[in-house]
Amino acid sequence: MAQQQTGSRKRKAPAVEADAESSPSQGLAAADGEGPLLLKRQRRPATYRSMAHYLKVREVGGWGPARLQGFDGELRGYAVQRLPELLTERQLELGTVNKVFASQWLNSRQVVCGTKCNTLFVVDVESGHIARIPLLRDSEARLAQDQQGCGIHAIELNPSKTLLATGGENPNSLAIYQLPSLDPLCLGDRHGHKDWIFAVAWLSDTVAVSGSRDGTVALWRMDPDKFDDTVAWHSEVGLPVYAHIRPRDVEAIPRAIINPSNRKVRALACGGKNQELGAVSLDGYFHLWKAGSALSRLLSIRLPYFRDNVCLTYCDDMSVYAVGSHSHVSFLDLRQDQQNIRPLCSREGGTGVRSLSFYRHIITVGTGQGSLLFYDVRAQKFLEERASATLESSSGPARRKLRLACGRGWLNHNDFWVNYFGGMEVFPNALYTHCYNWPEMKLFVAGGPLPAGLHGNYAGLWS
């Protein structure tokens, strides 16, 4: 692996705040230690700290620990199904950045985001404070090229949450930062991609794969211990220095007969513990790779819905890939010849599925129309609203699909907006990214207006 040190002319990024909040259980324990109620309170298990937990215990019956051991997984599944209908939105102000394409939780308060205007920043969801992160610059000057409108499309944390992968100042390069400090570690700008990076996935703590608009996937290996010997802070001016690396392997996806000019790699997802990698290309194909010291393609299959395949996720519990397209989500179970899970239709006016995530058997769908939908893959139906008590009848409550509508966000009232959209005051935001903080039951959602010429952003915390 070739390495070289380079000094960045940008300031050191502010360190991410440590998550030092005390847990609710510690507060309860302290309260229980006062007065003569100690013995009585000890009889109640300390695990019942929420109404959802209490209701589920009452439903299955009994308080004995022997009966609790068998339904811990059932309780989690119950919480996953009930959480969406309990969420309420609080919008976050992001200033004038254009369209948030990617996001990830760093800790219980901070989310890192990447935008179409090539801005990388951390937002504190409690205080609203925003800190920009300097982008890493290539070691050699590149030929002048128009990079307007490219942006940061991917942000991924490795399994141990010690490294963060995203795009560099040149969107063709892969930037790696250390966590929690967000100090730069290395930049993959040598013999890698020749066009923008659209997707990143971690196969392990030190191995990442990137997918590009040039139709290639690249395998990168990071060795922080090795970099410690070569990466240091400049002793005189305190500028960050980072290594420059090249990929271990670069492979091109096969060129399709139907649409050979549109084989851009749009999304990646790591497929469980088998070192397998799923990839979706804009020509309407799904590709499966085996990753070791190099990449080996296992198969390529035509997707049933092949317009705007822009997002991909994997469900560990069910060993299923989900692909978002123009108006559907398709499910791929590669263990079976026949697909037993039928595709779901988002029915959001053909604005497309823009973001997907799995948690257990529930998939969250972010649409181009500013809506969040929730689908139970096992039951093969959308989660439904619970009707109010006044609407219930003897035949049971009326149900309809649970749909969370996101707020207006911010929109730049420029000439494009006036000339092409007649000065529409309300314009739905495409939800390009969302990420859960499950321990605290929080959901971060972000995006911006769908038309390419419109400039704006949306971010919201649902809790």
Swiss-Prot record:
Residues 1-35 are annotated as: Disordered. It comes from the Eukaryota. WD repeats lie at residues 87-137, 138-184, 185-252, 253-297, 298-341, 342-376. SUPFAM superfamilies: WD40 repeat-like. Keywords: Repeat, WD repeat. Gene3D superfamilies: YVTN repeat-like/Quinoprotein amine dehydrogenase (2.130.10.10). Pfam families: Beta-prop_DCAF12 (PF23760). InterPro entries: Beta-prop_DCAF12 (IPR056151), DCAF12 (IPR051191), WD40/YVTN_repeat-like_dom_sf (IPR015943), WD40_repeat_dom_sf (IPR036322), WD40_rpt (IPR001680). One of its GO terms (cellular component) is Cul4-RING E3 ubiquitin ligase complex. Belongs to the WD repeat DCAF12 family. PANTHER family: DDB1- AND CUL4-ASSOCIATED FACTOR 12-LIKE PROTEIN 1, DDB1- AND CUL4-ASSOCIATED FACTOR 12-RELATED. This is DDB1- and CUL4-associated factor 12-like protein 1. It comes from Homo sapiens (Human). The gene is DCAF12L1.
